[in-house]
Amino acid sequence: MIGTTNGPTGIKLKSSRSNALRHLWKFTAAVVLLFATSNVADLARGEESAQENVAKIVFISGHPSHGPMAHEHRAGNMILADALQRSGLNVKCEVVPHPGYPEDKTIFDDAATVVVFCTGHRGHVLNPHLDAFDELMKSGVGVVMIHWATEAEKGKPGEKFLEWMGGFCDLDWSVNPHWAPTFDSLPIHPITNGVQPFSVHDEWYYHMRFVDEMKGVTPILSDLPPPETLRRPDGERSGNPAVRKAVAEGNPQVVAWAYDRPGGGRGFGFTGAHNHVSWQNENFLKVVLNAVLWTANQDIPKDGCPTPSINASQIKENLDAK
């Protein structure tokens, strides 16, 4: 009797517990699946958002203009693009695959900033495209002009350069000596993040033509040129009364500057980089990398953009055939 009575009761209890455990496992599995699905969706949304926020940087390189290891437009741009692409920062670099203004204008679609390294003045790549490029600038796209690219013709080109980056190299006002300024007093600005005092011998243009009262302009690299930078007779790029007076009065000369446009957008002018080997100076390179990021409205790490050391072999890569 005891076996007959307790046997069925025990079986029912065991079956009930098994069902409960099965339901618990199903519930747990459903919860885990729900959270996993949610996390995957969040990750996908995060990746999509990150892709949407990637800063696209376009590089324009001019045709060859000087001898080997001077005015290496494409090679210089490739150094910058490669360093930025490897930085781990949220950027995407696109170097125009041919010298001159882009044949495929869609490369500018969604661009955050444009880097221009080319022959200046009458040979500037932007001269035939001022109106189209102006539309980009008015939409808030940034711009970086390197070395001779900072030199514009008087008239409409110069006026546009003032609007886009606050200053330009102007014939019969600016000069182009080779010298070794010492940059030991750096301003507090995102472009100087991680930059240490340095000196590089290069062709540093100075006595730029700036907007009135330098409104919106922040000097980034400045120094007082020595008298020997003005030993040449007066000429378009060698000297003039105004620059001689400025140096004689002890006014430090700006060779790199940042510009906040009143209507939105940022510009940066950098007069060095005649000598291709200058890119081997880490601080020289970091200033320009930081400036590219700044004009693209990107946050710059407190130690600046991660900056590679360019060795003797790497500096000879991507050179133009000359």
Question: What is the meaning of each model-derived region?
Answer:
Residues T5-R17, L21-L24:
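Short, low-complexity, charge-dense intrinsically disordered segments
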Residues E48-A55, I79-D82, S87, T229, ...:
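Extracellular ligand-binding/catalytic regions of CAZymes and related secreted enzymes
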Residues K26-N39:
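Bacterial N-terminal signal peptides
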Residues D170-G263:
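Catalytic beta-strand/loop cores that center a nucleophilic Ser/Cys/Thr
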Residues S49-Q51, V58-I60, P64-A152:
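Helical hinge/lid and interdomain linker segments adjacent to catalytic or ligand-binding clefts
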Residues A75, I79, P128, A132, ...:
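Extracytoplasmic/secreted proteins, especially bacterial periplasmic and envelope-associated proteins
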Residues A41-G46:
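Boundary at the C-terminal end of the N-terminal hydrophobic targeting segment
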Residues G123-P197:
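A glycine-rich, often tryptophan-bearing local segment used as a flexible ligand/cofactor-contacting loop or short
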